[in-house]
């Protein structure tokens, strides 16, 4: 990794941590609040690509593991990885990787702005929602003993917010391509 890669990776790890400072939104009818940190995961994949995006998420999870309160609500420590929602944290790594991988394959400089934005959106939807939820729901169903159907239905309340996050990540990805053409290729 070059110095630029290290700086960009650390920057996006810091962005994910900073998004954890935003207060979580409680809906009342579900016990788990909506947080902004999954937006950071999508943004890391879209802007940095598969490898650097996944590394940025790994840095955040390492900070969590050593006990720093960098998750939404000031949470941190190894106990987080034993909670029923730990599958979503593990899913962040793969979500950022898949989002980045798809962004690298679907988006190029020769496309129109609309095609680039839609491609970034699809990458964020697949990596940041489908992959993330596959890990999170499977782990939640297993650890909490809910069964897959209950865990799946309970998680659907988060989909509208995550779609909005995917739109924001797509718009950011397009803005970075236009505004910073010298940013190293996503890899």
Swiss-Prot record:
Domain of life where this protein originates: Bacteria
Q: Which residues cross the membrane?
A: 10-30, 53-73, 78-98, 120-140, 152-172
* Keywords in alphabetical order: Cell inner membrane, Cell membrane, Membrane, Transmembrane, Transmembrane helix, Transport
Query: Its topology with respect to the membrane?
Result: Multi-pass membrane protein
Q: Does the keyword Ribonucleoprotein apply?
A: no
Does the record's keyword annotation contain Cell inner membrane? yes
| InterPro entries assigned to the protein according to its UniProt record, in alphabetical order | BioY
The primary site where this protein sits is: membrane
Single Gene Ontology MF annotation = biotin transmembrane transporter activity
Q: What happens when the gene is disrupted?
A: Mutant exhibits lower biotin uptake and has a diminished capacity to form nodules on bean plants.
Pfam families given for it?
A: BioY
Q: What induces it?
A: Expression is repressed by biotin.
Localization of this protein: Cell inner membrane
**CC terms in the record's Gene Ontology section:** plasma membrane
Q: Subunit info?
A: Part of a biotin transporter complex composed of BioM, BioN and BioY.
Q: State the family it belongs to.
A: Belongs to the BioY family.
Please give the function described in this protein's UniProt entry.
Answer: Involved in biotin uptake.
Q: What is this protein called?
A: Biotin transporter BioY
**Its gene?**
bioY
